[in-house]
Amino acid sequence: MRRTYGGQLWVASLAAASALTLLAARASAFCRSSTCQADSTCDYDEHGCPVGGHPTVWHRSCITFSVQEDGSPRMHITAEKAGQILEQAYGSWTNASCEDGTPSIQAFRLDPVSCNRPQVNLCDRNASIWIFHDDVWPYEDDDLTLALTWTHFDPGTGEILDTDVEVNTAQHVITTDPKGMGAQFVAIATHEIGHIFGLAHSPYLYATMFENYRLTNDMSELSNDDIQGICTLYPPDRKTGPCVPEPLNGFASDCGTERCDPEGCCSTAPGGNSGSKGGAMLLTGLGLLVGWRRRSGRRRSNLL
């Protein structure tokens, strides 16, 4: 299915390495991601939640994901194994118990893909990809980051169009063995999927969406705070169209075009954006940290 958007379309990739400040817990602490995080124009409330812009959310009733076909040889994680764990992690969110049912969004796994970088093609086919970086983590000053989610959206509405996740297996030991040493991939995945659905970091210490990885509890088990967040974003009675389980403009295994055509359609990826009419803007990413980092001038989230 091919979709078009009127006016100027920008895409942002939201790197949530927000300040590592421990805020007081409250009964309901979930925060929503916003378009204002793309250009750092947000204000922040007393709980650290972004204020301003449009909240980011999927308008459709189902989304898809794929694993990059190489998986992580260094961590002995095959694409198939990762896909199985991701199905479990997505299910934690989509099967959450809301007051009147379950969230009005589903997730479907598609075939592994050859594309090994995050991007969105506005005029071509796409894939929402989980990518493992075994050799080099491609971002500077990010040795604490376990994973990073890139959210591509329409800044005029906040509608999420595409997401990609990068996992830092170059600098961290990440395991799929529940008794193994290292960070649990299922916990990392569950946190990043919260970003995929439009949640920002929560100040609630025991939430899956807390920005730091914890060894003291299982982050793959949603807290009441996380459940309230997903049920608020996707209430069971939300009006949506029929489920079409394919990415924006259809599914592609390769990375597709990287240049704008004469009409202004293009792809966008971390590290660049297009100012052309109908082009795309990269928002930056949200992630999970393995440790504490002092507040810096930029907003980004690291999962520990």
Regions found by a protein language model. Give the residues of each.
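Bacterial N-terminal signal peptides that target proteins for export
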Residues: 2-14, 275-279
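N-terminal low-hydrophobic presequence detector
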Residues: 3-7, 191, 304
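Bacterial N-terminal signal peptides
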Residues: 12-21, 284-287
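C-terminal segment of classical bacterial N-terminal signal peptides
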Residues: 18-27, 292
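Zinc-dependent metalloendopeptidases
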Residues: 25-279
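A cross-kingdom C-terminal cell-surface attachment/processing module
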Residues: 278-295
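Cytoplasmic C-terminal tails of single-pass
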Residues: 298-304
